[in-house]
A protein has these predicted regions:
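Preference for intrinsically disordered or flexible, low-complexity segments
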Residues: 1-182
Length: 182
């Protein structure tokens, strides 16, 4: 294991990571304000994500390199994407084509803005990332955590300046690549 790498630009958003060479695992914390939004309780222990994060890193690299305004695909109540996604999932229709088209739009958008599909089995908070103007909205919905896992931050969101978000994530991705891919 090497020392923990704090990657931050301000007190709003930071990442910290530690690498475990013997298992090719990375321990990752995503700090919003003073809270690690990846933190979860399992049994009597408070933990954070620790896994092989190669797929997640590739997803994050693609997201920050192609970041563009891409509004949530349907009209739904909520300030942040995670909350909109909760509310948008109530849609129903007797028209099967309309029903399928609606949920296909949601699923396509989620693949571009939600990192959970790239988790590869990690216990990972369900985060959404959306560029809106000069800010990246980071939001989360951890209502449906796996059995035995209780996230400390269930639903919420924050806005981070695009430049700060990019710089922090890019620095993490470079540190990860330097450690694992060289």
């Amino acid at each position: 294991m090497i020392d923990t790498n704090p990657i931050t630009n301000n007190h709003t958003f930071a990442l910290t990571c530690s690498f475990f060479d013997d298992t090719h695992e990375t321990e990752l914390s995503t700090i919003i304000g003073e809270n690690n939004i990846l933190a979860f309780k399992r049994g009597n222990s408070i933990l954070t994500t620790r896994w092989n994060l190669d797929e997640l890193v590739l997803w994050l690299r693609d997201f920050i390199d192609t970041m563009a305004e891409d509004p949530y695909p349907v009209e739904a109540d909520g300030e942040y994407a995670a909350i909109k996604d909760i509310n948008a999932r109530d849609f129903d229709s007797d028209d099967e084509d309309k029903f399928d088209a609606y949920y296909d739009r949601l699923d396509d958008w989620n693949l571009r803005h939600r990192w959970h599909p790239a988790s590869c089995g990690a216990v990972l908070a369900d985060l959404y990332f959306q560029l809106v103007g000069n800010e990246v909205e980071i939001s989360w919905n951890n209502e449906d955590a796996e059995e035995g896992v209780e996230f400390l931050n269930i639903v919420g969101g924050v806005k981070v300046k695009k430049e700060n978000f990019y710089n922090v994530v890019d620095a993490f991705l470079k540190a990860y690549a330097l450690h694992w891919f060289n």
